[in-house]
Amino acid sequence: MRYTTSMDQEMKRRVTACAAGFSLPRYRELPAVGLYLDQTVQLVNSCFRGFPGVELTPSMVSNYVKKGVISHPVKKKYSREQLASLIYIVLSKNVLSLENIDTLFQMQRAHCTAAEAYDYFCDEVENCLPFIFEASSSIRDLDPDANDEKRLLRGTIVAAVNKMYLDCCFVAMRQEQALWPGILGDLE
């Protein structure tokens, strides 16, 4: 199968549209009551609907618990703090090892609450994503006095969102090729 070498304006529009209106629920908006495993997976995946490769499965959650990256559920229910951690893990797992994710969690716990860290993470994702997806022409700079945790978080988010962008581009290119098989190659 042959692919065109560049994205046309319609493909770019579709990729940019993935980022339009994207937002993550803030800590206070996450359910205060515990969720069972399937509900947890469904909620986390709903945050990234439309982004290929950014997903969570029940076996992944079990693996994160087994490796100690997140704590064990209480009576088979996952808490607000665990949901926030899983949302972060789902975004960063394609660019960081579980060991590095766990290191960042430990750094965060030493400096702020789970709610503060998660809400800052949401702000940073919503700052970086539109810029990388070319839906915004600017990105808010990090405070020059930002601590190491914030710098590492920004680096993680930029890497993860760039991966999301590339995945969306390749999906759009494949969809375009599927719509017009053979014709696109003949036009070159």
Question: Residue spans of the language-model regions?
Answer:
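Basic helix-turn-helix/winged-helix DNA-binding cores
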Residues: R2-R109
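Intrinsically disordered, low-complexity, charge-dense segments enriched in Lys/Arg
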Residues: M107, H111-E188
